[in-house]
Swiss-Prot record:
One of its GO terms (molecular function) is rRNA binding. The keyword Ribosomal protein applies. Methylated by PrmB. HAMAP family: Ribosomal_uL3_B. This is Large ribosomal subunit protein uL3. The lineage of its organism: Bacteria, Pseudomonadati, Pseudomonadota, Betaproteobacteria, Burkholderiales. GO terms for biological process: translation. The gene is rplC.
């Protein structure tokens, strides 16, 4: 079997500068050849640096980034002081990106990171978001179980999961048993999405395919950690 990992050059997480933003929604764009490409629009505009961490003061190098805005009544005193110290407007989300010390030193608190300085068309990215919550779901919807007979003697057991254990030995249900429960509302990352277009004026990223979460949900966009190596590299 051919190994697929040989064509990839994993990038250390400590060297991946990303941006935070929100999912605007899905649409499609057309190429010059008339091909329809489904894309998700991500708003990553106005990413402000709220803190720069260094090896000397914090033990590691990183930058802290915020996105969006928040009403003053929704900001705690501690957060208000943190944003005021950075000279940045209070945001709705805070995210830290670990970087190489030299790279982190290039940023200053209060500065804005432009989308074109991080991403470009044709690049592959990893997008992290919170999936849409589905509430309490049964095994058919949650784990793709098959249903039982609709008739022929079956009554009130059409969508039940069936046996969930054995007998007195082992006398318990094994951990990890697939059963009914809460579905969705978890953090998930979709890898290797192609950046189709970068809207510099509006700070938008158009990535091919779907990303986790509902429209308006927070997302984190990073350069793909498993991006294929460039030819000739």
């Amino acid at each position: 079997m051919e190994k697929t990992m040989s064509n990839t050059t994993p990038t250390p997480a400590a060297h991946r500068l990303g941006l935070v933003g929100r999912k605007v929604g899905m649409t499609r764009i057309f190429t010059e050849e008339g091909e329809s490409i489904p894309v998700t629009v991500l708003d990553v505009s106005n990413n402000r640096v709220t803190q720069v961490k260094s090896l000397e003061s914090d033990g590691y190098a990183a930058i802290q980034v915020t996105y969006g805005n928040r009403r003053a009544s929704r900001v705690t005193k501690a957060e208000a002081g943190h944003f005021a110290k950075a000279g940045a407007e209070a945001g709705s989300i805070l995210k830290e990106f670990r970087l190489d010390p030299t790279r982190a030193a290039e940023f200053t608190a209060g500065s804005v990171i432009a989308v074109e300085s991080v991403f470009e068309a044709g690049q592959q990215v990893d997008v992290t978001g919170t999936t849409i919550g589905k509430g309490f779901a049964g095994t058919i919807k949650r784990h793709n179980f098959g249903s039982q007979r609709a008739s022929h003697g079956n009554s009130r057991s059409h969508r039940v999961p069936g046996s969930i254990g054995q007998a007195q030995d082992p006398g318990r249900i094994f951990p990890g048993k697939r059963m009914a429960g809460h579905l969705g509302d978890v953090t998930r990352t979709v890898q290797n999405l192609d950046v189709v277009r970068v809207d510099v004026e509006r700070g938008l990223l158009l990535v091919k395919g779907a990303v986790p979460g509902h429209a308006g949900g927070d997302v984190i966009v990073r350069p793909a950690v498993k991006a294929p190596a460039k030819k000739g590299a």
